[in-house]
Design a protein with these regions (language model features):
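S-adenosyl-L-methionine
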Residues: 147-166
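Core catalytic lobe of class I
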Residues: 1-145
Length: 166
């Protein structure tokens, strides 16, 4: 991260998992949250995007009533089995989590970066929402899951170019 000065941390979002996995060791608190970092590229005078008015209607859960200012804590269940058809990843995020952040912080045609692509959820959702995406994943063992997820055999989708850089 030698160019960290080019990145602005805009906000953090706490993902509260109402159906978190139990703590089977009974030696610490049950882990029921994760943190997302919303960052943007600094420079050239361009401001980051935040669709404030839209977030009041697109984000609704028990912590965020529809029509109200959106908080940075979102209650979203764990990734359902149906979203793991391309394969399992130990930290896969639910589509709804990425849908919210991408709709809130970008417009159609914008580019979304995920430096920890994992199973490809961010790129998958970005494509569904007509955004471009750049994903980085250092673990080669997850490439088959990413490829399967981003190149589904469906006639309704455009082909997604996937470039593997080693």
């Amino acid at each position: 991260m030698q160019h960290l000065e080019d990145v602005k941390i805009n906000n953090s979002i706490v993902w509260f998992k109402p159906n978190a996995q139990p703590n089977i060791t009974c030696r610490f608190f049950t882990e029921s949250t994760e943190h997302l970092i919303w960052a943007s590229k600094n420079g050239n005078g361009k401001k980051w995007k935040f669709n404030y008015e839209a977030t009041k209607n697109l984000i609704e859960d028990r912590l965020n009533p529809k029509g109200k200012q959106t908080r940075n804590v979102w209650a979203i269940p764990l990734t359902p089995k149906a979203e793991k058809r391309a394969g399992k990843h130990p930290t896969q995020k639910p589509i709804e989590l990425l849908r919210r952040i991408i709709l809130a912080c970008s417009d159609e045609g914008d580019t979304v970066l995920d430096p920890f692509l994992g199973s490809g959820t961010t790129s998958f959702v970005a494509k569904m929402l007509k955004r471009n995406s750049i994903g980085i994943e250092k673990e080669n063992k997850y490439l088959p899951i990413i490829k399967k997820r981003l190149n589904p055999p469906q006639k309704t989708w455009d082909d997604i170019e996937l470039e593997v850089i080693r």
